[in-house]
């Protein structure tokens, strides 16, 4: 939306669930544009920090798009702090730095599910699966928007998780004491592959994730970035 506005397009309803776009017959101008930071990438690193029981600071998080995720995690027992807001380079996106601390989590009483903005982001929902593996009790994850994506959540069982598929949209996650290393072939879907990688970071021993194209297309230099904060990942080419 911000890019279109820089082209002179009028957009009503930014920040709501409904947009009204008033088009133009032609656009002929040069603009300099900075993309907004990615809330899904923020949630990836938050999830990785939680399951590895790490103290981790995740910088430049677009707070508007992960507020409900943080509130859910707070209710589950996550200890974290948030800096004052500051603007991204595009002068529109509100950013914060989030520092998470090792926490004892409990399963929420209510199910975790997505909703249109400002609800939990559809692509952030899978990150609650590895988190729920270490949250005492049982967590119901309801992935109602994607057909059969929840099936891939059970791949974490290969690492020692206890996840039961109730139907193509709902998975029941029972907490476990630990995960163990395993070899897993990446699913064709990006987010399920990402949560397998996150779970492997928390698993004891060595794991191997094969056929990683799906995650490479969604996360730039992910192995190198994780290694920079303490992971031990070797990319085999």
Where in this protein do the model-derived segments appear?
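Short, structured segments at the rim of ligand-binding sites
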Residues: 1-237
């Amino acid at each position: 939306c911000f890019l279109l506005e820089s082209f002179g397009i009028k957009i009503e309803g930014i920040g709501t669930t409904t947009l009204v776009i008033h088009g133009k017959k032609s656009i002929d101008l040069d603009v300099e544009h900075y993309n907004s930071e990615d809330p899904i990438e923020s949630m990836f690193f938050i999830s990785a920090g939680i399951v590895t029981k790490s103290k981790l600071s995740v910088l430049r998080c677009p707070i508007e798009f992960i507020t409900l995720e943080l509130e859910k995690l707070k209710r589950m027992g996550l200890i974290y702090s948030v800096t004052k807001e500051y603007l991204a380079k595009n002068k529109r996106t509100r950013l914060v730095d989030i520092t998470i601390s090792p926490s004892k989590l409990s399963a929420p009483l209510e199910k975790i599910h997505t909703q249109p903005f400002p609800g939990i982001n559809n692509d952030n929902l899978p990150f609650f699966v590895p988190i729920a593996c270490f949250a005492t009790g049982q967590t119901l994850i309801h992935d109602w928007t994607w057909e059969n994506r929840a099936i891939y959540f059970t791949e974490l069982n290969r690492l020692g998780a206890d996840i039961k598929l109730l139907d193509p949209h709902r998975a029941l996650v029972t907490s476990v004491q630990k995960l163990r290393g395993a070899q897993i072939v990446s699913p064709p879907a990006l987010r399920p592959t990402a949560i397998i990688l996150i779970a492997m970071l928390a698993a004891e021993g060595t794991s191997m994730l094969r056929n990683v194209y799906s995650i490479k297309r969604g996360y730039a230099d992910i192995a190198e970035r994780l290694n920079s904060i303490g992971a031990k990942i070797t990319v085999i080419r």
